[in-house]
């Protein structure tokens, strides 16, 4: 039996524009995904007597029907009978469930990355499996800052050294179903495409500050506390911009310097003890390259 430990990072949507609807009914997006230092931790026992998923904290997640289980099922079906080992996964969930931070997608991507290597599944099939499991899973395979378009199947990695590092994640302690948000989303008109991506740091920062999350108003209608959180975040000293992530209910504020983020975190924890509040940092591509060099 072999053991593997993998950390799966949360994502935030620096913006999320809904630009249309595909014939199949899925919405078409344009978004920039960034990943932050908030992780689920997964322990994989390969070749165990047992198989299945165990969540180490109390959770509403179905042990028999979840993104990890679906990912494993799709991968097994792409292998010859008898060539795969039992897989038993223990999951320490730190990313809030149904929060707009793609915890389930990150966990599935961790399983896909590991098992596709162990079982010799090629890159093209790996990407197909990721998309079958969920629209956020393809970008989570790399867990690097990326422009994401279409139904989540178009992923373009971005140079991200210009991004401010410091982030505060804030949300009400409630779950908000992505499906319920999209079921209510019925705009008079979709957002226009941003067209050509910015070519320099200043233009990127300008776009990020002026952009939005098109799902915000629907999510606020379902969870009004999101509006209060966004108003509070936008008023914090040193905040570059704040926004809801994904379909909510988690929001974030971006700061240029750590001191401003620390002072804001203390203020929030003192005045809003009932909110989920987590100070973290954006993971830049250079961080991952440095880590990879350290593992050689």
Curated annotation (Swiss-Prot):
It catalyses: 4-CDP-2-C-methyl-D-erythritol + ATP = 4-CDP-2-C-methyl-D-erythritol 2-phosphate + ADP + H(+). Signal peptide: none annotated. ATP binds at residues 96-106. The keyword Metal-binding does not apply. Pathway: Isoprenoid biosynthesis; isopentenyl diphosphate biosynthesis via DXP pathway; isopentenyl diphosphate from 1-deoxy-D-xylulose 5-phosphate: step 3/6. One of its GO terms (molecular function) is ATP binding. Keywords: ATP-binding, Isoprene biosynthesis, Kinase, Nucleotide-binding, Transferase. GO terms for biological process: isopentenyl diphosphate biosynthetic process, methylerythritol 4-phosphate pathway; terpenoid biosynthetic process. This is 4-diphosphocytidyl-2-C-methyl-D-erythritol kinase.
């Amino acid at each position: 039996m072999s053991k593997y430990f993998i950390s799966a990072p949360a994502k935030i949507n620096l913006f999320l524009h809904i630009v249309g609807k595909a014939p199949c009914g899925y919405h078409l997006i344009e978004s920039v995904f960034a990943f932050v230092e908030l992780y689920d931790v997964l322990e994989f026992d390969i070749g165990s007597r047992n198989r299945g998923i165990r969540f180490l904290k109390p959770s509403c997640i179905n042990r028999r029907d979840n993104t990890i289980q679906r990912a494993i099922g799709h991968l097994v079906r792409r292998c010859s009978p008898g060539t795969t080992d039992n897989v038993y996964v223990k999951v320490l969930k730190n990313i809030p469930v149904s929060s707009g931070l793609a915890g389930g997608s990150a966990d599935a991507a961790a399983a896909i990355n590991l098992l596709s290597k162990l079982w010799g599944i090629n890159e093209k099939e790996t990407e197909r499996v990721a998309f079958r499991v969920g629209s956020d899973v393809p970008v989570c395979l790399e867990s690097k800052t990326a422009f994401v378009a279409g139904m989540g199947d178009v992923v373009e990695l971005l140079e991200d050294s210009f991004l401010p590092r410091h982030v505060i994640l804030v949300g009400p302690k409630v779950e908000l179903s992505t499906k319920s948000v999209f079921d209510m989303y019925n705009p008079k008109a979709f957002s226009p495409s941003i067209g050509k991506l910015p070519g320099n740091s200043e233009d990127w920062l300008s776009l990020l500050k002026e952009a939005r999350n098109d799902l915000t108003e629907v999510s606020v209608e379902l969870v009004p506390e999101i509006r209060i959180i966004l108003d509070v975040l936008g008023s914090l000293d040193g905040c570059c911009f704040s926004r809801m992530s994904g379909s909510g209910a988690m929001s974030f504020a971006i700061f240029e310097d750590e001191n401003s983020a620390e002072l804001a975190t203390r203020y929030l924890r003192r005045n809003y003890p009932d909110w989920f509040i987590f100070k973290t940092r954006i993971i830049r591509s250079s961080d991952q390259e440095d880590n990879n060099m350290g593992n050689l």
